[in-house]
Regions:
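Mobile cap/lid helix-loop segments that border enzyme active or cofactor-binding sites
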Residues: 1-58
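Short alpha-helical scaffolding segments that buttress acidic/His motifs in well-ordered protein cores
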Residues: 32, 46, 63-68, 104-112
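Short acidic alpha-helix initiation/capping motifs at coil-to-helix transition points
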Residues: 39-43, 75-77, 112-121
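Short, thiol/selenol-centered motifs that function as redox-active sites or metal-ligating centers
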Residues: 61-84, 88
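Alpha-helical ds-nucleic-acid-binding substructure associated with the helix-hairpin-helix region
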Residues: 93-117
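Alpha-helical bundle/repeat cores within regulatory domains of eukaryotic proteins
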Residues: 123-126
């Protein structure tokens, strides 16, 4: 893991930015800071998040992201989004989903199964709902 005191100025700026924006820096992010371009690529998730909040809301983003994390069998990612859901009062094992949230969860699962072959029902419903 990257230690702040022994880091370059560029790494220190990224480290400080994380603390300012999120109050802390996770071990995974500290590890990624060994390579600033890799860290920045990972952090683009937050850019996407900020763009999607006005369209689908925080909860839907967390459910969608959790579905993708589960589908990819990414334990760290699954735990991250699971914690967000639990902290917001949801039960990730038995969420009560709106039609839009169900569609996004199904889409997340389909992306993991075969991103080049999303079922027509999901694709058509997404197009109708978000076009």
């Amino acid at each position: 893991m990257t230690e702040y005191e022994s880091s370059s100025e560029e790494v220190k700026r990224e480290y400080e930015d994380q603390i300012a924006k999120h109050g802390r820096i996770t071990n995974m992010k500290r590890t990624l800071l060994h390579n600033v371009p890799a860290f920045k690529a990972y952090m683009e998730w937050y850019t996407l998040y900020d763009q999607l909040v006005p369209v689908i809301g925080d909860r839907a983003i967390s459910l969608f992201s959790h579905a993708i994390s589960e589908g990819n069998e990414c334990l760290i990612c699954s735990i991250f989004f699971r914690k967000i859901l639990i902290d917001s009062g949801d039960d990730p094992d038995n969420p009560h989903l709106s039609d839009t949230e169900k569609l996004l969860v199904d889409f997340g699962g389909a992306i993991c199964k075969d991103p080049h072959n999303i079922p027509d029902e999901i694709s058509n419903t997404l197009s109708a709902r978000f076009s």
